[in-house]
Structures are given as C-alpha cells and as structure tokens.
Regions:
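Glycine- and acidic-residue-biased ligand/ion/polar-headgroup-sensing regions
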Residues: 17-40, 46-50, 139-141, 146-171
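A short secondary-structure junction signal
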Residues: 87-93, 114, 121-126, 143-148, ...
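Generic beta-strand structural signal
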Residues: 43, 49, 61, 73-75, ...
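A short glycine-rich, His/Asp/Glu-containing loop-to-beta-strand
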Residues: 1-26, 98-144
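Long amphipathic alpha-helical segments that form oligomerization/scaffold cores
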Residues: 81-109
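Catalytic micro-motifs at enzyme active sites that drive phosphoryl/nucleotidyl and oxygen chemistry
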Residues: 9-12, 38-41, 62-67
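Ligand-binding loop in jelly-roll beta-barrel domains
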Residues: 56-85, 168, 176
Length: 176
C-alpha cells in the first residue's frame, strides 16, 4: 500500500502484469487523477472514486493529477490476482464517488468502495475478494469492524490516531 499526496506527474507510463493496481482517491483531494492505459481506457478518477486495473498478462498505464499543482490524496494498492487469472486478459473497473455506498452512524461515516460492511455492498466485482472501507470517526467514537473467518485486516489511520483492541497507533507507527 502506498499512501501518497501528488500534485504533478510522478510516474511515466509503466507496465504491470500478474496482479491488480488499485487507486483510491480520498474525498479531500483537490483534483482527480487522469487515468489512461494500453487497453484504451481513458477516465478521470474523481475524489472519493476508485479505479481497479487487473493487469493479467500485461498492461501499461499512467495516472497523473488532472490539474497540475492541485493535490491528490490517494492510496495505491497492489493486490495479487488468483493464480488462474494472472495470465488472463487485462481489464479495468471504475467506481465513481457518488456510487460508493455510504453508511452514516452516530460519530462515524463508513464509505464502502470495495467489498461490504453490514448491509452495504460495493457495486464492483473485482477478481480478488477485497474489502476497502474509508472510515471517518469523530473524537472518542467507536466502531466495530467484524473480520470474517479466513480473512485478514489491515488498518491504516491516514489522519489522527486509532485504538484497536486496546492498542493505540497512528500513521507514524506504520513507518509511512
């Protein structure tokens, strides 16, 4: 996982193969990311939106801030493809910000760009089972996140700190 702020082109067009590259823009981004790839995909990933590139047997892509000088705040996540799909034809999935399911709770907002939380389910069906929750908590708010048997969880505070099962940590604890 790469947690980044970008305000200018950073990476020239580059190849990927055998895994998925997932880009999620946080709502506080000042601009979107212009995405293009060798499949002919050309789209704007808006703040709050997500783009999933399943590279399969190979794809070249580039993502740059749509407005140079304006900052994007994002996660770039590399997700392994199932072995049977690692040499499959590449494809891309996109989810606009307004299509991300949102649950507003007392003291918490949960956005579900991938996977599910409670009764909310992302409309995307990626080739790898992944849940991505963008959670905003008010001070001293609590939220239970059940982790199904056979799954693992990774929590990354991007602003402030959190306490999980009694252990406190913040972004600095991740070496970011």
């Amino acid at each position: 996982i790469d947690h980044a702020w970008m305000s200018a082109p950073t990476f020239p067009p580059h190849p990927h193969a055998g895994f998925s590259a997932v880009t999620y823009l946080f709502l506080d981004s000042e601009t979107g990311m212009a995405n293009r790839d060798s499949l002919g995909t050309r789209n704007l990933i808006e703040p709050g939106g997500l783009h999933w590139t399943a590279a399969g047997r190979g794809v070249v892509h580039e993502e740059v801030p749509a407005a140079t000088g304006s900052t994007t705040h994002l996660l770039q996540i590399f997700v392994n493809l199932p072995e049977a799909r690692q040499n499959a034809a590449p494809f891309a999935l996109s989810l606009a910000s307004q299509d991300v399911p949102v649950l507003q709770l007392p003291g918490a907002r949960v956005r579900v760009p991938l996977g599910s939380y409670g009764e909310l389910h992302s409309p995307l069906a990626p080739p790898t089972d992944v849940t991505l929750l963008d959670i905003t908590l008010e001070a001293d708010a609590e939220l239970a996140i059940p982790v199904p048997a056979g799954h693992r969880a990774f929590v990354m505070p991007v602003n402030g700190s959190a306490e999980i099962d009694g252990a406190g940590f913040g972004l600095d604890d991740l070496g970011a």
